[in-house]
Amino acid sequence: MGAVRTALVDALFAALPVALVYFSGWAYLTSYLGQFGIDATQFDVSFTTVLVYAFVPLQSCMVLGAIAVIVVLGFIGFLIEFHAKEDSKGVRTVAASFGLFAVVLVVVLLFIIKAAATTAARDMSDNVWKGEKSQSVVPLVDPRKDDPSVKLYNACRDGRRLRQVIGLPNQLFLMCRSAVDECNRGTLFAVSSEGKILYSADKVREEINVRKICQP
């Protein structure tokens, strides 16, 4: 029974870091895309892409501090149980208490990561609206000149108002900032890897009436 328990604990500790990193990346990605009304579940996002974005919220001081506390408590619990060679009920109870507290902190850590991801995603979306993110121009393949979305796209391109939201292997999301209210309003374009406009949608920045991100 002890060997089974040890194997389960080892498996948990081995999988936990990967699960937390993946959760961090997915929380950031969904929050960031949600700022533009994009549902991340509607298209394929590779595992490596999620892992890359995971390091944005993981750099938060609150997240790093919580992780450090969990590691220290888990290590202390391990040392207590490791040195309890005899079947000391009191010592094992203390070790179990440390382990339980560490599990509770892991749950709390999920909420901390989510909060950090939301804050980082909002800051990154502000960079798009302020025009501080990279400008991207995707040539359209055989565009219909009379299509209103094509005309708007070309006007945005010529006015250097296109900013990349995110680039994926099969499509690219671009934000055309409004020529009148560039920090708050615009048009979102989804462009395929073949250079075709999949759809376009008018967008208004979230918290437009709460936060001003550009000087008047």
What are these model-predicted stretches?
Residues 1-98:
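N-terminal first transmembrane alpha-helix
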Residues 2, 80-82, 89, 111, ...:
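Residue-level marker of intrinsically disordered, low-complexity segments enriched
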Residues 51-54, 98-112, 131-151:
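Cytosolic juxtamembrane regulatory segments of multi-pass membrane proteins
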Residues 66-83, 126-131, 154-170:
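Alpha-helical membrane-embedding segments
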Residues 88-122:
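Internal/C-terminal transmembrane anchor helices
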Residues 115-136:
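Alpha-helical transmembrane signal-anchor/signal-peptide segments
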Residues 133-216:
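Extracytosolic and intramembrane catalytic regions of membrane-associated proteins
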